[in-house]
């Protein structure tokens, strides 16, 4: 099957996307017209197919991605130099519900997970040390080093300390955000046992923090306040960890329905192929998972700007619509309160890859959540309560957003990328490449290649393989970030540091 040199994503579009580098003077046939390229245009970038006067909206995915800065001719390379965002401040929105019937068959798929005492299911069985404050990061790391040396991690998946810089010198919202994320980590089903490690004098007071955990498993979550230890806190910490480890290593995987999966949806280092390959692939999986009774979460609120009405109109009811309006406008207010324009999001890598405006990025980004209705809206630090597709308040920053997804209860994160990135958060963070060159050049980073979609592979066939891969990772196969040992957390901060 011959590979096409371009794709027109939506019949209403005024641009096509090049699937390979194209030269000035090359011609393409679009809608019965012959278009001659006026400049060399890289793969993933846009070519105008109709003349556009200054101020004319340019359409991609069937929606405006900005307007022409000057008059443009058919065949021109459309990029950040001649395309300007339409985004400004906060807006008023009207609820126009769209209830699309997906008609996806329910399958009896299962994975091998760890069923916890409270009924939640983990895809990993790990022992974690969670510092309440950054002052004890070194102690936490040393304890992990000692336990690894003593046990070799035999019988469990990993031993890890989740170090961070916070827990003290913070006020109000930042302080609560830190406490909520650390609480969520302690309660995460991927942990078979947790040692909460405190200094003792921090703002994040240990007794108050433990109360935040609610009705937790006291056998599997223990507290050590280092300032209260007379003598060597490492010795005392190891006593506790040995007991926690002994319990965790008795846990065994068992077959559970795929409806127990909670998956985070994230993208980073996006390019012009993101909205054509990897994001639609993840969207198809998200719809499939929701149809099985499972859960997916979309975040990166600033990267919804320009596509937010699509999500708002997919809300199951007016209450969720109003929550989504607040989700969007609150983040716009956050930008504006710091004197920053809401449309200045695409990074240099995004632009080099073919993304010119935030609308361009957002309309591709939101492909990750498919077409399922929005059934829940979460604030930062909230834990999942509703199955189905949820929206979560968090910024676009890769590590902050991925940490927020895992904190909400996702057992793994699906991360699409066109430029490539090695990082991972505290749950398996699977990388899905938008193009085959990335998958070929960085096999040590990439878990799955969606670039095959522009090389003749049918979506339904690739989705089937993708589902199998996700179930394999949920059942214990290491994601590349785990294999490489790239795992960390990052907590959102927007206030003063004392």
PLM feature segments, named:
Residues 2-412, 419-422, 427-498:
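Metallocofactor- and cofactor-centric catalytic cores in central/energy metabolism, strongly enriched
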């Amino acid at each position: 099957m011959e590979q096409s040199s371009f794709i027109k994503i939506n019949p209403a579009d005024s641009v096509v996307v090049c699937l390979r580098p194209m030269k000035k003077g090359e011609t393409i046939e679009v809608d019965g017209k012959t278009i001659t390229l006026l400049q060399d245009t890289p793969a993933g970038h846009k070519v105008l197919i109709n003349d556009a006067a200054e101020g004319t909206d340019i359409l991609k995915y069937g929606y405006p991605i900005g307007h022409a800065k000057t008059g443009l001719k058919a065949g021109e390379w459309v990029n950040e130099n001649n395309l300007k965002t339409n985004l400004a401040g906060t807006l008023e929105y009207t609820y126009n519900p769209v209830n699309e019937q997906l008609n996806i068959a329910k399958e009896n798929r299962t994975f091998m997970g760890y069923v916890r005492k409270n009924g939640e299911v983990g895809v990993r069985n790990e022992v974690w040390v969670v510092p309440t404050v950054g002052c004890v990061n070194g102690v936490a790391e040393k304890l992990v080093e000692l336990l690894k040396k003593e046990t070799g991690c035999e019988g469990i998946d990993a031993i890890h300390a989740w170090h961070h810089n916070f827990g003290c010198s913070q006020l109000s919202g930042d302080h609560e955000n830190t406490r909520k994320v650390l609480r969520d980590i302690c309660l995460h089903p991927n942990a078979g046992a947790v040692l909460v490690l405190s200094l003792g004098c921090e703002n994040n007071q240990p007794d108050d923090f433990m109360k935040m955990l609610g009705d937790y498993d006291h056998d599997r979550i223990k507290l050590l306040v280092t300032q209260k230890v007379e003598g060597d806190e490492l010795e005392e910490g190891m006593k506790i960890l040995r007991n926690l480890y002994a319990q965790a290593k008795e846990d065994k995987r068992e077959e559970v329905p795929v409806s127990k999966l909670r998956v985070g949806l994230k993208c980073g280092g996006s390019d012009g192929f993101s909205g054509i390959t990897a994001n639609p692939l993840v969207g198809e999986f998200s719809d499939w998972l929701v149809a099985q009774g499972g859960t997916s979460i979309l975040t990166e609120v600033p990267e919804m700007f320009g596509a937010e009405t699509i999500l708002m109109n997919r809300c199951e009811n007016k209450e969720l619509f109003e929550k989504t309006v607040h989700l969007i406008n609150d983040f716009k207010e956050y930008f504006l309160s710091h004197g920053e324009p809401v449309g200045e999001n695409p990074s240099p890598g995004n632009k080099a890859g073919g993304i010119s405006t935030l609308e361009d990025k957002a309309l591709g980004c939101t492909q990750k959540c498919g077409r399922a209705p929005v059934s829940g809206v979460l604030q930062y630090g909230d834990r999942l309560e509703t199955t189905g597709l949820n929206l979560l308040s968090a910024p676009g920053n890769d590590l902050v957003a991925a940490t927020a997804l895992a904190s909400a209860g996702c057992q793994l994160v699906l991360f699409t990328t066109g430029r490539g990135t090695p990082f991972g958060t505290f749950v398996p963070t699977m990388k899905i490449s938008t193009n085959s060159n990335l998958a070929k050049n960085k096999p040590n980073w990439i878990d799955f290649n969606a670039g095959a979609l522009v090389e003749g592979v049918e979506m339904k066939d690739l989705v089937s393989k993708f589902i199998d891969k996700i179930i394999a990772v949920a059942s214990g196969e290491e994601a590349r970030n785990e294999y490489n040992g790239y795992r960390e957390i990052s907590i959102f901060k927007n206030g003063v540091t004392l």
